[in-house]
A protein has these predicted regions:
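A conserved catalytic-core signature of glycosyltransferases
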Residues: 116-117, 138
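Nucleotide and nucleotide-moiety/phosphate-recognizing core
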Residues: 1-116, 124, 129, 146-155
Length: 177
């Protein structure tokens, strides 16, 4: 695609600027984990004050290692975590609001037309579990252990499914904007 996903443009903003703007309406701090091309991403963000950047030196181990890096950067006393991937830039603010409705469950996962997506919410009680599994494994292992404690949040937001993994997916995203 020619540049880091975080710096791809969507509706006049980079993916990362859009996500930090939307998420900052609901939570603080916003922790952004960078790995490959970290300097390019930091310098390409238009509103860096909205985020705390954490650099994952082990990003090549996969997404869980980046999640763990971000969790280690969080303040000690938090209620929970909203977690998303930078290649899901089209999530609506209303979806985040729905995930954060009280009382908050251990896990909240959005669904659109029966398909689950991002972001997810998890309570602080799960942070230790995510940190305890090998960084080259998958977060799904922790989520699977707690499906009976999960609130499934049905939303009218196809953006939770938008996963921009290649140039074709990016074109589809831009065409729907």
């Amino acid at each position: 695609m020619g540049s880091p996903k975080a710096l791809l443009e969507f509706r006049g903003e980079t993916f990362l600027d859009r996500l930090t703007r939307v998420f900052s309406q609901f939570c603080s701090p916003i922790v952004v984990v960078v790995g490959a091309q970290a300097d390019d991403i930091r310098s390409g963000v238009k509103r860096p004050e909205r985020a705390i950047f954490a650099e994952n030196a082990n990003y090549q181990l996969g997404q869980l290692s980046s999640m763990q890096c971000g969790l280690r950067t969080m303040p000690e006393k938090i209620e929970g975590v909203l977690f998303t991937l930078v290649d899901h830039p089209n999530v609506q603010a209303s979806t985040i609001a729905a995930l954060l409705e009280q009382p908050r469950p251990l896990l909240a996962i959005p669904r659109y037309q029966g398909r689950r997506g991002h972001p997810i919410y998890f309570g602080a009680g799960l942070i230790g579990e995510f940190l305890s599994i090998p960084p080259d494994s998958q977060a799904k292992a922790v989520i699977a252990r707690h499906l009976d404690e999960t609130r499934w949040v049905d939303v009218d937001d196809p953006g939770i499914l938008d996963d921009v993994d290649d140039a074709a997916a990016y074109r589809r995203l831009i065409e729907t904007a």
